[in-house]
């Protein structure tokens, strides 16, 4: 995992507190090496079978690895978010949002072990439709659990 929890939380809080219009801090875990940053753009996307199948495939990788590693029962909730931010309309970027919470009113992003993250990233990077993968490192508050 890229860095220590304390430093990531400090940076995330600094960003979201300094710019009130920013409510998320995400870390890029992977970008397809064949795609340049300037090639990634918002794409028009619909909630159709093909897109949902892609989301389910990515989510299944994450959930399988969480189960295998024993982390599934340690996190309160995990969301896999499909972003229409890609090089073309048939591709997507995804955000991982595992959180830990005891009272639902507050939550911290789950700091998954490096080996678990590496397994997840490696498998997702093999999928031909994935242009980028991010990790939501925002606590609640200021962020909510879900993405709207």
Region annotations inferred by a language model:
Residues 1-148:
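ATP/NTP-dependent adenylation/nucleotidyl-transfer catalytic domains that generate, transfer
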């Amino acid at each position: 995992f890229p860095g220590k929890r304390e430093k990531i939380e400090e940076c995330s809080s600094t960003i979201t507190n300094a710019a009130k219009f920013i409510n998320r801090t995400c870390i890029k875990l992977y970008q397809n090496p064949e795609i340049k940053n300037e090639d990634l753009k918002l794409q028009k996307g619909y909630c159709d079978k093909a897109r949902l199948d892609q989301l389910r495939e990515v989510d299944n990788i994450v959930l399988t690895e969480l189960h295998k590693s024993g982390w599934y029962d340690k996190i309160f909730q995990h969301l896999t978010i499909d972003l229409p931010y890609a090089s073309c309309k048939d591709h997507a970027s995804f955000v991982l949002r595992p959180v830990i919470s005891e009272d639902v009113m507050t939550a911290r992003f789950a700091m998954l072990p490096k080996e678990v993250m590496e397994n997840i990233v490696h498998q997702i990077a093999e999928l031909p439709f994935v242009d980028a993968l991010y990790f939501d490192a925002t606590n609640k508050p200021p962020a909510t659990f879900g993405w709207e």
